[in-house]
Structure formats: C-alpha cells, structure tokens
Amino acid sequence: MKTVKFFLGALALAAVSMFTAPAVNAQEDGNRDENGKVVRGPYLTNQFGDNWAVGVAGGINLFMDGGFKTAVGGALDVNVTKWVTPAVGGRLGYSGLTGAEWSDASTALGTVLDDSKNMFKQKFGFAYVHADVLWNISHAIGGYKETRLWNFIPYAHTGWLRTYGRAGAEFADNEFAMGLGLLNNIRLSKRLDLTLDVRGILTNGRHHAYVGGVAGALQTTLGLSVNL
C-alpha cells in the first residue's frame, strides 16, 4: 500500500504544473474564431500518414518496494506517437535500461550484504514495452494552437515488463505492468520538441526476484521529439 500511495503522490505533484497552464495557454491568440472565442473543435480527423512523431530520451529510474527502500538506475526511452486529433493520441514505446532495489533477503540479483544498510542491493536490467493513450490537456482546454510553447499531456499506459540479471546473474521474469504519466512537450521549432516525461509504473514484486507484493517505479526522462 505504501508503494501505491507513493506512486499516486508523485504523480499528483507532477500534475500540479499541468493544471496551472491551461488558463495561460487559453489567452494565446491565433486559436480564436471571428468572435474572439477559443476554438476547441470539432476538428477534422487526419489521414493515417499525418501527425506522427518519434522521440528518444534519457534519465533515471527510481525503483521502490512496499517499505520505501529505493535505488536509482539509468533510463532510456524510445517511442513513436500518432495524434488522431489535436487532443487525443496514441504512443508505442520502449522504456528500460538498468534498475536496482534494496531487499531484506539475498536473491539471484544480489547476494552481497551492504553493512551500512543491513540489506542486499538487487541490480538488474529491464525492458518495458508499452502502449499509451495520450490526452493533450492544453489543446483540449485552451484550444488547438500549433505554435503553443508548452503542451501538458497526461496519459495512461500498459504493457509487458521483462527483468533480467546483470553481471552474470541468472534471472529472468516477465510481468504485466501499468500506470500513469505526465508528458511535457516544449516547442523548439516546427519539427522539434523538448520533452520532459514523468511516468509511474506498477508491477508484481516478482520482477526483482522477490516473492509477491506490488513493486513500483518512477521514471523521469528528458529528450527530444521530432514531428514527421
């Protein structure tokens, strides 16, 4: 339960910035009709080949278990996004690289006791292949504007998470995972966006050779997205 509360609390803090932006974005000109009202639709849906983007990012993974014992690993994020309307889109992605968690017991992922913590550090690699449903709240509330500087995009994700041993450790596990996230798109040019993505992941505690329970991870990445 502590993991779930931590997960929800972290996302709530990330979401504060999301709700401070729409009022400002709505004041921008260029997305208003002849009466000065913000245009929020309806929109013509685009063709399959329109409004795609590819992105790559790097950052950190913060894994935790029910006791708030956390450890940091490196994160790599690669994704492809398709916007169906200005406010609704889908994304397929790979997230992963390295992870670590503290455990009270020795497992296949960690057998050396850390005397300062009286715990065993579990080190592993992981790959999370996921599908996301995106909602651009800036366009949904403030109306579509191509030149908007900052877009706030909450999303839900689900997918397959594979964990494997590092440094010769013999371990592999596959689990269902899901969660919520907040994507910030900052416009650099017509074709290029700076991205800041905060993602919470929930999965089974077995993923790091622990028996049962719920495990969580908070992933934060900074990267670039190219609009095709």
Ranges and model annotations:
Residues 1-45, 228:
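Cleavable N-terminal export/targeting peptides
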Residues 24-82:
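Short glycine/proline- and aromatic-enriched beta-strand/turn motifs that initiate or cap beta-hairpins
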Residues 53, 89, 151-153, 179, ...:
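Membrane-spanning beta-strand positions in outer-membrane beta-barrel proteins
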Residues 87-176:
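Gram-negative (and chloroplast) outer-membrane scaffold detector with strong preference
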Residues 90-94, 101-113, 117-119, 124, ...:
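Predominantly the C-terminal beta-signal and adjacent terminal strand-loop region
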